[in-house]
């Protein structure tokens, strides 16, 4: 039976994965009585790829955290609920094929974990680290839903590749540092393992964008090469706890990504400052594409909250004391960004968006504290 810290962490991670799936599959969140109730068998290759890839991390997370069977069945149940709700969303088309591919993806994710943990000959300590016993691994897992959301927006606007690249650079830095400290000796095999891990991570997260393979493949291959190169370089520090030094390199890149994401497209014409209450006032077919970048923005603030909490991890601040600080800092960032967005042509600043991203940041910080509590339990501290 899992300990309390493991149960809490599992619930938070699985809840986060399910929440992101719901955000991506149920937007624009507008319900209406349908003219016809039923499911279709129609689909296309893009939807097949997206639906499989979307549920792979869910199945992986399920086995990773709960270590129980049933990911296949649970994926089918969640997918059926989603497709049933889509009957009442005018711009959505519920499909039996979607249920089957979601279920397949969930099973593949669970199988991937089983293969890594039981079939591949790696030290048990490495499998332990894969199970989030290294705080930076939590960041790697949280970046996967961010890549999902980015990939959906990328598909509608290919010129957003720079945002995909910035997320990838964050992953590159984290993977290279983790592998450097997992293996003290430098060898081509360690660099190769780091590159393969980074590549698998990127292509799982960017699966929905594989319908435009050239830019995605280019970024993925560049990511793998850079990860291998950075892993082969000598360690800059011999400290056992290397998270803070790694975060110093991640923060500038992630900060630039967050700013560009909020202002995208940054070259839009300027106008008088203006603000709106909600996200959008249009519920049309195009609204799905308009909302995808906004969902990416919410997910990005969850990652920001995790980064901020991990930055102060050494101080051992309890969650109750850290939440007010997270609230103040994330509120300051959110309001500063909305102030800048208000001068751009278009919807302008959004009060609802500012509130929602602060909540997202608090959730990200909470995940870090749950993870840290679980690590302390595993270490007997």
Predicted regions and their residues:
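Bulky hydrophobic segments
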Residues: 1-97, 103-381
């Amino acid at each position: 039976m899992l300990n309390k810290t493991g149960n809490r962490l599992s619930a938070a991670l699985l809840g986060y994965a399910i929440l992101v799936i719901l955000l991506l599959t149920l937007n624009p969140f507008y319900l209406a009585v349908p003219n016809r109730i039923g499911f279709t068998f129609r689909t296309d290759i893009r939807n097949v790829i997206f639906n499989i890839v979307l549920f792979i991390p869910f199945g992986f997370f399920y086995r990773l955290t709960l270590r129980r069977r049933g990911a296949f069945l649970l994926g089918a149940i969640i997918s059926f609920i989603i497709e049933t709700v889509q009957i009442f969303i005018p711009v959505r088309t519920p499909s039996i094929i979607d249920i089957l591919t979601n279920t397949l993806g969930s099973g593949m994710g669970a199988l991937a974990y089983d293969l890594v943990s039981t079939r591949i000959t790696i030290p048990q300590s490495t499998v332990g680290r894969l199970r989030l016993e290294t705080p930076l691994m939590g960041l790697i897992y949280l970046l996967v839903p961010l890549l999902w959301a980015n990939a959906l927006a990328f598909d509608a606007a290919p010129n957003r590749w720079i945002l995909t690249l910035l997320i990838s650079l964050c992953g590159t830095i984290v993977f290279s540092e983790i592998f450097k400290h997992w293996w003290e000796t430098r060898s081509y095999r360690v660099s190769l393992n780091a590159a393969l891990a980074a590549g698998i991570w990127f292509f799982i997260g960017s699966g929905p964008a594989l319908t435009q393979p050239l830019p995605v493949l280019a970024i993925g291959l560049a990511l793998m090469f850079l990860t291998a190169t950075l892993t082969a370089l000598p360690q800059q520090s011999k400290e056992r706890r290397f998270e803070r030094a790694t975060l110093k390199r991640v923060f500038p890149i992630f900060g630039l990504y967050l700013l560009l994401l909020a202002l995208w497209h940054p070259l839009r014409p300027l106008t008088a400052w203006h603000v709106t209450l909600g996200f959008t006032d249009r519920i049309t077919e195009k609204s799905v594409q308009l909302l995808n970048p906004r969902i990416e923005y919410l997910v990005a603030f969850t990652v920001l909250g995790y980064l901020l909490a991990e930055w102060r991890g050494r101080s051992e601040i309890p969650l109750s004391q850290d939440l007010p600080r997270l609230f103040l800092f994330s509120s300051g960032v959110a309001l500063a960004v909305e102030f800048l967005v208000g001068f751009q042509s278009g919807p302008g600043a959004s009060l609802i968006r500012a509130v929602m991203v602060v909540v997202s940041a608090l959730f990200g910080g909470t995940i870090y504290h749950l993870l840290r509590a679980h690590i302390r339990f595993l270490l007997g501290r």
